[in-house]
């Protein structure tokens, strides 16, 4: 949820691990990846170090998909810019990304963005580079895992059998 830090501990802010019931926590539980404090959505937790490494390392090209709202219009030309790899205002270039414009108006646009890397504040910086600011950001997919529509913000659940099979297949093939 917004306002929580994606970390195992933080001296100034509550963390995503603070949401866990005591019986669901182990000393080695940690989040796979990060969400900014103002970002919501899907976050995987694990106590399996090799799995976490494989899901995060850029060489494995795990895609993450986000619902994004920005404060201005987007045009088809932006789709091409994302496909070619956005260059941040500081000169850093991102890997190609997929941009799907759901709707666009002069004051606000809704999109889906799919990335295969995770630079610091990447989605926000990508949109700033094309002249708009992110006003809402929600991760809805992480690889083959989708945000469970039955969960409310801040809720969690263990992986189901199908999802465990996805993990097993992933580990066997990588």
Protein language model features and the residues they cover:
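Basic, flexible Lys/Arg- and Gly-enriched helix-loop patches that mediate nucleic-acid binding at interfaces
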Residues: 1-174
